[in-house]
Amino acid sequence: NPFAQFLKLETDFVKYWRITQDGTLVGHVNAGIIWSYGNAENAPYYEQFYIGGANSVRAFNVRSIGPGRYQPTNSKYSYIDQTGDIKYLMNLEYRQKVWGNLYGALFLDAGNVWTLRNHEYSSLGKFDVDKFFRQLAVGTGVGVRYDMGMFVIRVDWGIGLHVPYDTGKNGIYNIRRFKDAQSLHFAV
Protein backbone atom coordinates (compact mmCIF):
# COMPACT_ATOMS: atom_id res chain seq x y z
CA ASN A 1 0.00 0.00 0.00
CA PRO A 2 1.24 3.51 -0.79
CA PHE A 3 0.15 4.89 2.57
CA ALA A 4 0.09 3.93 6.25
CA GLN A 5 -2.96 4.27 8.46
CA PHE A 6 -2.20 5.69 11.90
CA LEU A 7 -3.37 8.29 14.39
CA LYS A 8 -0.78 10.43 16.18
CA LEU A 9 -1.56 12.61 19.19
CA GLU A 10 1.08 14.76 20.87
CA THR A 11 0.95 17.51 23.46
CA ASP A 12 3.52 19.97 24.72
CA PHE A 13 3.37 22.04 27.91
CA VAL A 14 5.91 24.72 28.87
CA LYS A 15 5.89 26.91 31.99
CA TYR A 16 8.29 29.77 32.82
CA TRP A 17 9.01 31.07 36.32
CA ARG A 18 11.12 34.20 36.81
CA ILE A 19 13.33 33.41 39.82
CA THR A 20 15.56 36.49 39.76
CA GLN A 21 15.88 39.50 37.48
CA ASP A 22 18.24 37.54 35.20
CA GLY A 23 17.28 33.95 36.09
CA THR A 24 14.40 31.84 34.79
CA LEU A 25 13.24 28.32 35.61
CA VAL A 26 11.58 26.51 32.70
CA GLY A 27 9.48 23.36 33.06
CA HIS A 28 8.57 21.31 29.97
CA VAL A 29 6.45 18.17 29.49
CA ASN A 30 5.96 16.45 26.13
CA ALA A 31 3.80 13.34 25.70
CA GLY A 32 2.44 11.49 22.73
CA ILE A 33 0.92 8.29 21.40
CA ILE A 34 0.68 6.71 17.94
CA TRP A 35 -1.97 4.12 17.10
CA SER A 36 -1.43 2.18 13.87
CA TYR A 37 -4.42 0.45 12.31
CA GLY A 38 -5.68 -0.97 9.04
CA ASN A 39 -2.82 -1.66 6.66
CA ALA A 40 -0.05 -0.55 9.06
CA GLU A 41 1.43 -2.51 11.94
CA ASN A 42 3.67 0.48 12.75
CA ALA A 43 3.63 4.16 11.89
CA PRO A 44 6.21 5.29 9.32
CA TYR A 45 9.70 5.53 10.80
CA TYR A 46 9.84 9.33 10.54
CA GLU A 47 6.58 9.63 12.54
CA GLN A 48 7.71 7.40 15.43
CA PHE A 49 8.83 8.88 18.74
CA TYR A 50 12.39 8.75 20.07
CA ILE A 51 14.35 9.87 23.14
CA GLY A 52 17.87 11.24 23.37
CA GLY A 53 19.58 14.08 21.58
CA ALA A 54 19.70 17.86 21.77
CA ASN A 55 15.93 18.35 22.17
CA SER A 56 15.18 15.46 24.50
CA VAL A 57 17.11 13.71 27.30
CA ARG A 58 20.40 15.46 26.56
CA ALA A 59 22.58 13.01 28.50
CA PHE A 60 22.09 10.42 25.75
CA ASN A 61 22.63 10.28 22.00
CA VAL A 62 19.66 10.57 19.68
CA ARG A 63 17.46 7.43 19.49
CA SER A 64 19.62 5.59 22.03
CA ILE A 65 17.06 5.03 24.81
CA GLY A 66 14.09 2.68 24.81
CA PRO A 67 11.72 1.40 23.93
CA GLY A 68 11.04 0.59 27.57
CA ARG A 69 13.82 -1.53 29.08
CA TYR A 70 15.21 -2.60 25.70
CA GLN A 71 19.00 -2.46 25.39
CA PRO A 72 20.65 -3.12 22.05
CA THR A 73 23.26 -5.86 21.97
CA ASN A 74 25.49 -7.32 19.31
CA SER A 75 22.58 -9.39 18.03
CA LYS A 76 21.11 -9.17 14.54
CA TYR A 77 18.82 -6.38 15.81
CA SER A 78 21.54 -4.09 17.19
CA TYR A 79 21.22 -1.73 14.21
CA ILE A 80 17.64 -0.78 15.09
CA ASP A 81 17.16 2.85 16.04
CA GLN A 82 15.16 2.84 19.23
CA THR A 83 11.73 4.32 18.53
CA GLY A 84 8.30 3.83 20.04
CA ASP A 85 4.55 4.42 19.91
CA ILE A 86 4.33 6.19 23.28
CA LYS A 87 6.55 9.05 24.43
CA TYR A 88 6.94 10.84 27.74
CA LEU A 89 9.55 13.55 28.25
CA MET A 90 10.03 16.12 31.00
CA ASN A 91 12.70 18.78 31.42
CA LEU A 92 13.49 21.28 34.14
CA GLU A 93 16.02 23.95 33.22
CA TYR A 94 17.40 26.97 35.05
CA ARG A 95 18.68 29.72 32.73
CA GLN A 96 20.87 32.51 34.07
CA LYS A 97 21.97 35.55 32.10
CA VAL A 98 25.78 35.75 32.18
CA TRP A 99 26.59 38.76 30.01
CA GLY A 100 24.73 40.47 27.17
CA ASN A 101 22.94 37.78 25.18
CA LEU A 102 24.96 34.94 26.73
CA TYR A 103 23.17 32.59 29.14
CA GLY A 104 24.21 29.62 31.23
CA ALA A 105 21.89 26.69 31.92
CA LEU A 106 21.56 23.84 34.41
CA PHE A 107 19.08 21.11 33.46
CA LEU A 108 17.45 17.84 34.52
CA ASP A 109 15.77 15.66 31.86
CA ALA A 110 13.78 12.42 32.10
CA GLY A 111 11.90 10.36 29.52
CA ASN A 112 11.47 7.25 27.44
CA VAL A 113 9.49 5.74 24.58
CA TRP A 114 7.47 2.52 24.62
CA THR A 115 5.68 0.28 22.15
CA LEU A 116 2.01 -0.62 22.27
CA ARG A 117 2.70 -4.16 21.06
CA ASN A 118 5.41 -6.77 21.60
CA HIS A 119 7.99 -6.96 18.81
CA GLU A 120 10.03 -9.94 17.63
CA TYR A 121 13.29 -8.34 18.78
CA SER A 122 12.07 -7.57 22.28
CA SER A 123 9.10 -7.66 24.61
CA LEU A 124 10.93 -5.27 26.97
CA GLY A 125 9.64 -2.23 25.08
CA LYS A 126 5.92 -2.71 25.67
CA PHE A 127 4.31 -0.06 27.87
CA ASP A 128 3.46 -1.15 31.42
CA VAL A 129 2.07 1.55 33.73
CA ASP A 130 3.39 -0.31 36.81
CA LYS A 131 6.97 0.08 35.55
CA PHE A 132 6.63 3.63 34.21
CA PHE A 133 8.89 5.52 36.64
CA ARG A 134 11.55 2.78 36.76
CA GLN A 135 11.79 2.91 32.97
CA LEU A 136 12.55 6.61 32.67
CA ALA A 137 16.05 7.57 31.52
CA VAL A 138 17.34 10.47 33.64
CA GLY A 139 20.13 12.90 32.90
CA THR A 140 21.44 16.24 34.07
CA GLY A 141 23.94 18.71 32.73
CA VAL A 142 25.03 22.24 31.95
CA GLY A 143 24.84 24.38 28.86
CA VAL A 144 25.59 27.71 27.24
CA ARG A 145 23.10 29.66 25.12
CA TYR A 146 23.59 32.68 22.89
CA ASP A 147 20.36 34.50 22.02
CA MET A 148 20.50 35.88 18.47
CA GLY A 149 16.97 37.33 18.65
CA MET A 150 15.42 35.18 15.92
CA PHE A 151 17.03 31.97 17.22
CA VAL A 152 19.23 30.64 20.02
CA ILE A 153 22.54 28.85 19.53
CA ARG A 154 23.22 26.39 22.33
CA VAL A 155 25.73 23.80 23.48
CA ASP A 156 24.75 21.28 26.17
CA TRP A 157 26.88 18.75 28.03
CA GLY A 158 24.65 16.03 29.46
CA ILE A 159 25.53 13.45 32.08
CA GLY A 160 23.44 10.30 32.43
CA LEU A 161 22.16 9.38 35.88
CA HIS A 162 19.83 6.46 35.17
CA VAL A 163 19.11 4.15 32.23
CA PRO A 164 15.93 2.04 32.13
CA TYR A 165 17.65 -1.26 31.32
CA ASP A 166 19.63 -3.60 33.56
CA THR A 167 23.29 -2.55 33.93
CA GLY A 168 24.16 -4.80 36.85
CA LYS A 169 24.12 -1.81 39.22
CA ASN A 170 21.28 -1.05 41.62
CA GLY A 171 19.92 2.29 42.70
CA ILE A 172 19.15 5.57 40.99
CA TYR A 173 22.64 6.03 39.51
CA ASN A 174 23.02 2.82 37.55
CA ILE A 175 25.50 3.88 34.85
CA ARG A 176 28.47 1.49 34.72
CA ARG A 177 31.22 3.96 33.80
CA PHE A 178 31.13 7.75 34.00
CA LYS A 179 32.85 8.12 30.62
CA ASP A 180 29.93 6.24 29.01
CA ALA A 181 27.39 8.57 30.60
CA GLN A 182 28.19 11.79 28.76
CA SER A 183 26.92 13.44 25.62
CA LEU A 184 27.66 16.79 23.98
CA HIS A 185 25.00 18.48 21.83
CA PHE A 186 25.01 21.54 19.61
CA ALA A 187 21.64 22.96 18.55
CA VAL A 188 20.10 26.01 16.92
Functional labels for PLM-detected ranges:
Residues V144-G149, R176-V188:
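Outer-membrane beta-barrel "beta-signal"
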Residues K15-W17, Y94-Q96, Y146-M148, I159, ...:
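Residue-level signature of outer-membrane beta-barrel architecture
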Residues S122-M148:
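Strand-loop-strand
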Residues N1-K97, L106-F127, K131:
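C-terminal outer-membrane beta-barrel translocator/porin domains of Gram-negative envelope proteins
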Residues D109-G111, L116, G141, R145, ...:
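Flexible, small/polar- and glycine-enriched "cap/hinge" segments at structural transition points
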Residues T20-L25, G100-G104, Y146-V155:
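Repeated loop/turn-to-beta-strand initiation elements of outer-membrane beta-barrel proteins
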Residues T167-K179:
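Surface-exposed intrinsically disordered loops and tails
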